[in-house]
Amino acid sequence: SASNEWIKYSLILSYNTQTESTTYHIVSFKNANDVLNTTLNFNEKYLINNVNKVDDFLFFTDNYNPPRKINVTKQYQYPTTIAGEDDSTVYNDILVIKSPPTKSPSIQNLNTNVQDTFMEERFICFAYRYKYEDDEFSATSQWTSPSFIPKPFNLSIENYLNEGMVNNTNTAIITYNSGPSIVTGIEILFKEANSNIIKIIEEINKTQNGVVNDTDYEYTFTDSKIFTILSEGEILRLYDNVPLLANSQTLMGNRIMYGNYVEGYDLKDVNGNT
């Protein structure tokens, strides 16, 4: 960090020895009385001793901030001003952890005049996940209850079965949230209640579809089509296990490993006491 009487700057930069050019990847600042501390939030008492480069990603941790990374091919936005306004670089943009949707989508079950019977004998649950820059994906949201409303009881004399036990719903209206500005896309997902296979219903590009940030949208699901299947491991990916703080970091088997770390939050009562 370099400092003057009023502002302390924190930088992440790279120098190209061949072109003798400097790239400022991130510029952030802290004002003189330490009230404002933007994006990088470096502290001279907590040195960055652990750095790993994986492809175009530079991972680092200082045991003062959560584990973070940057794309070394990218220049992040500069602060808007040095007069005390927030840094225009979103703090969450450089976190290793990518936040998933905070809750499951909501669904409205309908019986419409569509002829497709895909949902008739299926217990279908819905979820969604966020896509971030650099093709990173969050964990999935929580899953909804099955979209199933039985038809009236109808006992068959021939086989003594309740033939009314089929889905009276053939359409589900799924309401999801578009997420913050660093979310570039949304994938709407479904799975059958008795299966671990997750399928993608729709991939929504926020820019191409004019999707507004942090806004609820609806998607109407009616029929069967050719779905993309997610890898089997996604059903077990309930969350991304990135620590709150980590004192050490290394690369092992193409995985980032953290050591001497802090994870989890203290449980608090209604009064905010731990």
Task: Show the residue positions of the predicted features.
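Disordered, low-complexity "stalk" and linker segments at domain junctions of extracellular
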Residues: S1-T274
